[in-house]
């Protein structure tokens, strides 16, 4: 199965060690969401994505992230890590590759709006 990661699980971030240790491959693909979403930075410093847009924030954007191939064990581990269903919930979205192929993948959406410093959405967590 494939999971779209957009935050601290990405390469070069603190929690990437989880994917590095347990993913099926040591490589990933850079992809972008087909639909637009609102991604914001919480006051805790990590990003969250809203499934449904909120008029409290700027316009939704196509999000950039990494696509990782994982197994059943890792998806259950990520569910616990992402505190599903309290903090996040897992759902599916479509992402597009650079060659324009579209794929259905998992993503973690915020279960509720978190506190933010501003209302400006971001395209990519850097």
Predicted stretch roles:
Residues 1-126:
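Glycine-aromatic micro-motifs
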């Amino acid at each position: 199965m494939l999971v779209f990661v957009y935050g601290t699980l990405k390469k070069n971030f603190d929690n990437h060690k989880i994917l590095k240790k347990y993913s099926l491959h040591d490589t990933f693909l850079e992809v972008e969401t087909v639909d637009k979403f609102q991604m914001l930075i919480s006051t805790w410093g990590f990003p969250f994505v809203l499934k449904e847009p909120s008029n409290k924030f700027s316009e939704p954007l196509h999000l950039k992230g990494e696509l990782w191939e994982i197994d059943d064990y890792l998806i259950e581990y990520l569910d616990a890590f992402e505190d599903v269903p309290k903090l996040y919930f897992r759902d599916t979205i479509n992402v597009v590759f650079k060659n324009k192929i579209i794929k259905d993948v998992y993503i973690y959406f915020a279960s509720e709006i978190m506190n933010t410093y501003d209302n400006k959405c971001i395209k990519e967590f850097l």
